[in-house]
Amino acid sequence: MGCFNFIKVMMILFNMLIFLCGAALLAVGIWVSVDGPSFVKIFGPMSSSAMQFVNVGYFLIAAGAVLFALGFLGCYGAQTESKCALMTFFFILLLIFIAEVAAAVVALVYTTLAENFLTAVVVPNIKKEYGSQKDFTQVWNSTMAGLKCCGFTNYTDFEGSPYVRKNGTFPPYCCYDSVNNSFMEPCNNFTAHNMSVQGCFKQLLYDIRTNAVTVGGVAAGIGGLELAAMIVSMYLYCNLE
Protein backbone atom coordinates (compact mmCIF):
# COMPACT_ATOMS: atom_id res chain seq x y z
CA MET A 1 0.00 0.00 0.00
CA GLY A 2 1.44 3.35 -1.06
CA CYS A 3 1.68 6.42 1.14
CA PHE A 4 -1.30 8.07 -0.57
CA ASN A 5 -3.56 5.04 -0.12
CA PHE A 6 -2.49 4.62 3.51
CA ILE A 7 -3.29 8.26 4.32
CA LYS A 8 -6.58 7.91 2.46
CA VAL A 9 -7.59 4.91 4.60
CA MET A 10 -6.55 6.73 7.79
CA MET A 11 -8.61 9.74 6.69
CA ILE A 12 -11.66 7.53 6.18
CA LEU A 13 -11.24 5.79 9.56
CA PHE A 14 -10.66 9.09 11.37
CA ASN A 15 -13.77 10.63 9.87
CA MET A 16 -15.83 7.54 10.61
CA LEU A 17 -14.90 8.13 14.26
CA ILE A 18 -15.96 11.79 13.98
CA PHE A 19 -19.20 10.66 12.30
CA LEU A 20 -19.98 8.24 15.15
CA CYS A 21 -19.07 10.84 17.80
CA GLY A 22 -21.42 13.30 16.11
CA ALA A 23 -24.22 10.74 16.13
CA ALA A 24 -23.57 10.06 19.83
CA LEU A 25 -23.64 13.78 20.69
CA LEU A 26 -26.88 14.18 18.78
CA ALA A 27 -28.42 11.33 20.77
CA VAL A 28 -27.20 12.73 24.11
CA GLY A 29 -28.37 16.23 23.15
CA ILE A 30 -31.86 14.95 22.42
CA TRP A 31 -31.80 13.00 25.70
CA VAL A 32 -30.77 16.09 27.72
CA SER A 33 -33.45 18.20 26.03
CA VAL A 34 -36.12 15.62 26.87
CA ASP A 35 -34.94 14.47 30.32
CA GLY A 36 -32.34 16.83 31.86
CA PRO A 37 -32.58 15.60 35.51
CA SER A 38 -31.63 12.03 34.52
CA PHE A 39 -28.58 13.39 32.69
CA VAL A 40 -27.52 15.27 35.85
CA LYS A 41 -27.95 12.18 38.05
CA ILE A 42 -25.66 10.12 35.82
CA PHE A 43 -22.95 12.66 34.98
CA GLY A 44 -22.83 14.52 38.28
CA PRO A 45 -22.30 18.12 39.41
CA MET A 46 -20.08 19.30 36.55
CA SER A 47 -22.86 18.52 34.08
CA SER A 48 -25.39 20.38 36.20
CA SER A 49 -22.99 23.33 36.45
CA ALA A 50 -22.78 23.53 32.68
CA MET A 51 -26.57 23.50 32.47
CA GLN A 52 -26.67 26.79 34.39
CA PHE A 53 -24.70 28.66 31.74
CA VAL A 54 -25.78 27.14 28.42
CA ASN A 55 -28.66 25.06 27.17
CA VAL A 56 -26.65 21.84 27.10
CA GLY A 57 -29.26 19.95 25.08
CA TYR A 58 -29.29 22.42 22.19
CA PHE A 59 -25.52 22.87 22.40
CA LEU A 60 -24.91 19.11 22.07
CA ILE A 61 -27.43 18.83 19.24
CA ALA A 62 -25.67 21.63 17.34
CA ALA A 63 -22.19 20.22 18.02
CA GLY A 64 -23.34 16.72 17.12
CA ALA A 65 -24.88 17.89 13.86
CA VAL A 66 -21.65 19.69 12.88
CA LEU A 67 -19.48 16.65 13.69
CA PHE A 68 -21.95 14.32 11.97
CA ALA A 69 -21.84 16.40 8.78
CA LEU A 70 -18.07 16.92 9.01
CA GLY A 71 -17.40 13.20 9.45
CA PHE A 72 -19.62 12.33 6.51
CA LEU A 73 -17.97 14.97 4.34
CA GLY A 74 -14.47 13.74 5.22
CA CYS A 75 -15.35 10.09 4.55
CA TYR A 76 -17.08 10.96 1.29
CA GLY A 77 -14.23 13.19 0.11
CA ALA A 78 -11.53 10.61 0.85
CA GLN A 79 -13.47 7.61 -0.49
CA THR A 80 -14.62 9.22 -3.74
CA GLU A 81 -11.46 11.36 -4.04
CA SER A 82 -13.62 14.46 -4.47
CA LYS A 83 -11.50 17.61 -4.41
CA CYS A 84 -14.58 19.75 -3.75
CA ALA A 85 -15.56 17.71 -0.67
CA LEU A 86 -11.99 17.69 0.67
CA MET A 87 -11.62 21.45 0.26
CA THR A 88 -15.01 22.03 1.93
CA PHE A 89 -13.93 19.74 4.79
CA PHE A 90 -10.67 21.70 5.15
CA PHE A 91 -12.34 25.11 5.30
CA ILE A 92 -15.05 24.01 7.76
CA LEU A 93 -12.39 22.53 10.05
CA LEU A 94 -10.29 25.69 9.70
CA LEU A 95 -13.26 27.86 10.71
CA ILE A 96 -13.94 25.63 13.73
CA PHE A 97 -10.27 25.81 14.76
CA ILE A 98 -10.21 29.61 14.48
CA ALA A 99 -13.47 29.86 16.45
CA GLU A 100 -12.05 27.65 19.23
CA VAL A 101 -8.87 29.72 19.50
CA ALA A 102 -10.91 32.95 19.55
CA ALA A 103 -13.26 31.53 22.22
CA ALA A 104 -10.29 30.47 24.38
CA VAL A 105 -8.72 33.94 24.12
CA VAL A 106 -12.02 35.65 24.96
CA ALA A 107 -12.57 33.30 27.91
CA LEU A 108 -9.12 34.05 29.29
CA VAL A 109 -9.16 37.81 28.71
CA TYR A 110 -12.80 38.62 29.40
CA THR A 111 -13.64 36.32 32.33
CA THR A 112 -15.04 39.23 34.37
CA LEU A 113 -17.16 40.44 31.46
CA ALA A 114 -18.50 36.91 30.98
CA GLU A 115 -19.31 36.70 34.70
CA ASN A 116 -21.23 39.99 34.58
CA PHE A 117 -23.17 38.87 31.52
CA LEU A 118 -24.03 35.48 33.00
CA THR A 119 -24.99 37.09 36.32
CA ALA A 120 -27.50 39.29 34.51
CA VAL A 121 -28.99 36.20 32.87
CA VAL A 122 -28.77 33.50 35.55
CA VAL A 123 -29.58 35.35 38.80
CA PRO A 124 -33.03 36.60 37.67
CA ASN A 125 -33.88 33.00 36.73
CA ILE A 126 -32.88 31.80 40.20
CA LYS A 127 -35.07 34.43 41.85
CA LYS A 128 -37.96 33.45 39.60
CA GLU A 129 -37.68 29.65 39.32
CA TYR A 130 -35.81 28.21 42.32
CA GLY A 131 -38.29 26.46 44.57
CA SER A 132 -41.16 26.50 42.08
CA GLN A 133 -39.78 24.82 38.95
CA LYS A 134 -38.84 21.23 39.88
CA ASP A 135 -36.22 20.46 37.22
CA PHE A 136 -34.53 23.85 37.60
CA THR A 137 -34.38 23.45 41.39
CA GLN A 138 -33.03 19.90 41.12
CA VAL A 139 -30.27 20.94 38.73
CA TRP A 140 -29.18 23.75 41.04
CA ASN A 141 -29.29 21.48 44.09
CA SER A 142 -27.04 18.97 42.30
CA THR A 143 -24.64 21.76 41.38
CA MET A 144 -24.45 23.21 44.89
CA ALA A 145 -24.13 19.79 46.54
CA GLY A 146 -21.39 18.67 44.17
CA LEU A 147 -19.30 21.85 44.10
CA LYS A 148 -19.99 22.88 47.71
CA CYS A 149 -21.16 26.31 46.55
CA CYS A 150 -24.18 28.59 46.93
CA GLY A 151 -26.08 30.28 44.11
CA PHE A 152 -24.37 31.86 41.13
CA THR A 153 -22.58 34.61 43.08
CA ASN A 154 -23.65 33.96 46.71
CA TYR A 155 -26.68 33.44 48.96
CA THR A 156 -28.25 36.79 47.97
CA ASP A 157 -29.17 35.26 44.59
CA PHE A 158 -32.02 33.44 46.37
CA GLU A 159 -33.53 36.52 48.00
CA GLY A 160 -37.15 36.82 46.87
CA SER A 161 -37.16 33.36 45.30
CA PRO A 162 -40.18 31.03 45.72
CA TYR A 163 -38.05 28.82 47.99
CA VAL A 164 -37.20 31.64 50.41
CA ARG A 165 -40.75 32.99 50.37
CA LYS A 166 -42.13 29.55 51.18
CA ASN A 167 -39.57 28.36 53.78
CA GLY A 168 -38.27 31.62 55.21
CA THR A 169 -34.69 30.30 54.90
CA PHE A 170 -32.01 29.94 52.25
CA PRO A 171 -31.03 26.58 50.73
CA PRO A 172 -28.94 24.57 53.24
CA TYR A 173 -25.95 24.61 50.86
CA CYS A 174 -25.58 28.34 51.62
CA CYS A 175 -24.83 27.51 55.25
CA TYR A 176 -22.34 24.70 54.70
CA ASP A 177 -19.57 24.44 57.30
CA SER A 178 -16.58 22.98 55.44
CA VAL A 179 -14.58 22.54 58.66
CA ASN A 180 -17.14 20.27 60.32
CA ASN A 181 -18.66 19.01 57.05
CA SER A 182 -22.15 19.94 58.21
CA PHE A 183 -24.97 22.39 57.52
CA MET A 184 -25.69 25.17 59.99
CA GLU A 185 -29.38 25.52 60.85
CA PRO A 186 -31.48 27.51 60.45
CA CYS A 187 -29.96 28.88 57.25
CA ASN A 188 -31.19 32.43 57.68
CA ASN A 189 -29.73 35.69 56.42
CA PHE A 190 -27.38 36.07 59.40
CA THR A 191 -25.97 32.53 59.17
CA ALA A 192 -25.60 32.57 55.39
CA HIS A 193 -23.78 35.90 55.55
CA ASN A 194 -21.36 34.65 58.21
CA MET A 195 -20.63 31.35 56.42
CA SER A 196 -19.74 33.18 53.17
CA VAL A 197 -20.02 30.09 50.97
CA GLN A 198 -18.44 30.61 47.54
CA GLY A 199 -20.71 31.22 44.54
CA CYS A 200 -20.89 28.39 41.99
CA PHE A 201 -19.41 30.40 39.10
CA LYS A 202 -16.23 31.26 41.03
CA GLN A 203 -16.08 27.73 42.42
CA LEU A 204 -16.33 26.28 38.93
CA LEU A 205 -13.55 28.62 37.73
CA TYR A 206 -11.43 27.53 40.70
CA ASP A 207 -11.96 23.84 39.88
CA ILE A 208 -11.07 24.44 36.23
CA ARG A 209 -7.89 26.33 37.18
CA THR A 210 -6.99 23.60 39.68
CA ASN A 211 -7.23 21.08 36.83
CA ALA A 212 -5.65 23.42 34.29
CA VAL A 213 -3.10 20.82 33.16
CA THR A 214 -5.83 18.32 32.31
CA VAL A 215 -8.03 20.94 30.63
CA GLY A 216 -5.07 22.31 28.68
CA GLY A 217 -3.98 18.82 27.66
CA VAL A 218 -7.42 17.95 26.33
CA ALA A 219 -7.64 21.27 24.46
CA ALA A 220 -4.16 20.78 22.97
CA GLY A 221 -5.05 17.23 21.94
CA ILE A 222 -8.22 18.34 20.17
CA GLY A 223 -6.36 21.18 18.46
CA GLY A 224 -3.62 18.78 17.35
CA LEU A 225 -6.16 16.37 15.84
CA GLU A 226 -7.85 19.22 13.98
CA LEU A 227 -4.53 20.44 12.58
CA ALA A 228 -3.59 16.89 11.55
CA ALA A 229 -6.96 16.43 9.81
CA MET A 230 -6.51 19.71 7.92
CA ILE A 231 -2.99 18.73 6.82
CA VAL A 232 -4.14 15.29 5.66
CA SER A 233 -7.14 16.66 3.75
CA MET A 234 -4.91 19.21 2.02
CA TYR A 235 -2.35 16.49 1.20
CA LEU A 236 -5.05 14.36 -0.42
CA TYR A 237 -6.41 17.40 -2.26
CA CYS A 238 -2.99 18.33 -3.68
CA ASN A 239 -2.22 14.76 -4.78
CA LEU A 240 -5.48 14.20 -6.65
CA GLU A 241 -5.50 14.72 -10.39
Swiss-Prot record:
The gene is TSPAN1. Pfam families: Tetraspanin. Interacts with SLC19A2. Interacts with NTRK1/TRKA. SUPFAM superfamilies: Tetraspanin. It comes from the Eukaryota. Residues 1-11, 74-88, 233-241 are cytoplasmic. GO terms for biological process: protein stabilization. Glycans are attached at residues 141, 154, 167, 180, 189, 194. It comes from Bos taurus (Bovine). GO terms for cellular component: cell junction; lysosomal membrane; nucleoplasm; perinuclear region of cytoplasm; plasma membrane; vesicle. It is found in: Lysosome membrane. Structural component of specialized membrane microdomains known as tetraspanin-enriched microdomains (TERMs), which act as platforms for receptor clustering and signaling. Participates thereby in diverse biological functions such as cell signal transduction, adhesion, migration and protein trafficking. Regulates neuronal differentiation in response to NGF by facilitating NGF-mediated activation of NTRK1/TRKA receptor tyrosine kinase and subsequent downstream signaling pathways. Plays a role in the inhibition of TNFalpha-induced apoptosis. The keyword Glycoprotein applies. Belongs to the tetraspanin (TM4SF) family. This is Tetraspanin-1.
